[in-house]
Amino acid sequence: MSHLVQLIDGQWLAGEGKPFESMDPAKNEVIWQGGAASASQVDAAVKAARAAFYHWSDLALEDRLAIVRRYADLLGEHKEALALTIARETGKPLWETRTEVAAMQGKIAISIRAHDERTGTVENPMPGAKAFVRHKPHGVVAVFGPYNFPGHLPNGHIVPALIAGNTVVFKPSELTPMVAEAMLKIWQEAGLPKGVLNLVQGEVETGKALAGNPDIDGLFFTGSSRTGHFLHQQFAGQPGKILALEMGGNNPLIVKDVSDVDGAVHAIVQSAFITSGQRCTCSRRLFVERGARGDALVKRLVEVVGQIKVGLYDAADQPFMGAMISEKAALGMVAAQANLQQLGGESLLTLKHLEAGTGFVSPGIIDVTAIGALPDEEYFGPLLQLIRYDDFDAAIDQGNATSFGLSAGLLGDNEADWQHFFKRIRAGIVNWNKPITGASSAAPFGGIGASGNHRASAYYAADYCAYPVASVEDSKAAMPDQLSPGLTF
């Protein structure tokens, strides 16, 4: 257990706010305890970041990159320990948390390349002078992290922000404070100067204090649509502050004319049930053609999903699904399923809470075709809604019938169908014959509508971590060859 859980100006401090704790959702054990950061501690963290800003941003880029690269090396050295920490706090299997740490490490080189390509210096010739486009850091930025990828996703904001020369105050999810603490200790080991990256742990009040601090220059958020909308309202009337929002989705996956049924079923499983359905890109709605071909695919899907192994993150025989983040989240999925059943949905595979006190659930599939007004909700767990369709265009229209717009996909053999689908579907990530949970860090990541505010992260994070500055320059002031009308010298 740790009591010094806030990192402010290079010092580990006890939180002055109310105590909170983190649970291992697979073993129902308290694994971390600490006090939340008070409003005054949040303010101190912002002040520390402000005090460190000029020193950090004035460093040569290569000097900043040397520390960031050292952090990447240390992630490799601490891979097993960090993977276990993530597994204990999230319930995800070790095979998956190891891939998360690897993604954190891989983010470094990608972020460096993106910074160079998207925010480098450009010189354009012009008569009698030189024109430049350069980029400058915003200053002090807040980063809010989620619980589903407590290392990788905040890392995707923090790394490009630091490369650009910003200083950061990081507020992780209150459900994964132990992972955040481990990350910050690795940054310290890498030699990051004090005040450049500060950590404020806590629940809602800590987050409100940070988001509402008048001295931050921006906020980068990954999390629920509800919280993102609250932040958007809080930032209203403050155009001088940049707000980058990455939120959830009610993501459609359409199946049409597939010849390899098992290949399609595998893509569906990876789209809907990986990470126990706790990825923002997970498929929530599956559209399958009516008729014998669709019936065969649904039958095979139910067979395969019914055999998915659910178990402890550290089991010798690794499961595909671990626990959800908490018992509360697990019970929320049971309640969501019951609501859909009450509206007319028919469970083909019932999601069940497997063990009291834990986040373990079995995966579920529910046919919601008969529900006339399907709720536009993101059910953040392993519950897949099945919709049978007759007309491809109608399926696309229904897929678009959501306030969200994060990910979407088509499973089908016809390229003309794919081209049509790509043109019509509204989402920021659109895949063909691949799981819609699959995304490349070398591409932008984000959505439209209630899924984000057009501030795509991943490769495009460099865009919101620095602002462009246009300059026209000459080595000295000089009279022009010809004066403007009405001027006399």
Curated annotation (Swiss-Prot):
This protein's name: N-succinylglutamate 5-semialdehyde dehydrogenase
Residues annotated as the enzyme's active site? 246, 280
GO molecular function terms noted in the UniProt entry? succinylglutamate-semialdehyde dehydrogenase activity
Give an example GO biological process.
Answer: arginine catabolic process to glutamate
Q: Write down the CDD domains for this protein, in alphabetical order.
A: ALDH_SGSD_AstD
Alphabetically ordered keywords of this record: Arginine metabolism, NAD, Oxidoreductase
Binding-site residues, NAD(+): 223-228
Task: Give EC number(s), comma-separated.
Answer: 1.2.1.71
